[in-house]
Amino acid sequence: MAAPLKLISHKLCPYVQRAVIALTEEGVAFERIDIDLANKPDWFLAISPLGKTPVLQVGPTAIFESAVILEYLEETQPKPLHPSDALARAEHRGWIEFGSAVLNDVAGFYAAPDEATFNAKVSQLGQRFARLETRVAATPWFDGESFSLVDAVFGPVFRYFDVFDDIADFGILAEKPKLMRWRKALAARPSVRAAVSADYPVLLRDFIDRRNSWLSGLQARVAA
């Protein structure tokens, strides 16, 4: 890949994290440029039709949407993270979409305005993870010994719970031993660790505080 790569990023964005993990795993050099999504610069809006991160700039060309970025890397790098078998690749793509659905549920969890909505989101997340528990391999990664794009997607998902667990034990991952082993393995993976800055937990807690949600109120009570 001859063209210089720039990844337009936001420090908390889980979709950026999955792109960073994939780039790192594939040994691709890139420059990361963080922006403030609450005050998007004009140059960013000019290259991001949806106004979202991540955007991967490959020379003069801007690639937007994390799924597209991941597939571009798969097609251009010598050591792809997808399985070589077509059917297995298709299944992995399905679980990547499942991971995106879980992220939507996580957003509903931290933004829930009242206790009833919050509890419904807790239940929904528990059901999502219970389904995932039935599929994930007992060995370190999603599908066994090889780190895949599904692993890159769920590293950022589990990272949220490092902060959520400091607020309270919501029981979402309880009695899911394979997920807990997977979560621990992902947390120790260098590419996953390097996908965020050291101040990520502080930034996420501040983000939650500003949601004016049920979780932000609970976080404030715990901190008091």
Q: Which residues make up each language-model segment?
A:
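GST-like domain detector, emphasizing the conserved glutathione-binding G-site
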Residues: 1-146, 176, 211-215, 219-224
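Functionally engaged cysteine thiol sites
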Residues: 13, 152, 204
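Hydrophobic/aromatic-lined pockets within catalytic cores
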Residues: 74-78, 100, 137, 158, ...
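Charged, solvent-exposed alpha-helical segments that act as regulatory interaction surfaces
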Residues: 105-108, 167, 192
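GST superfamily/GST-like fold recognition
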Residues: 142-167, 172-181, 185-186, 196
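Long hydrophobic alpha-helical segments typical of transmembrane helices together
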Residues: 184-224
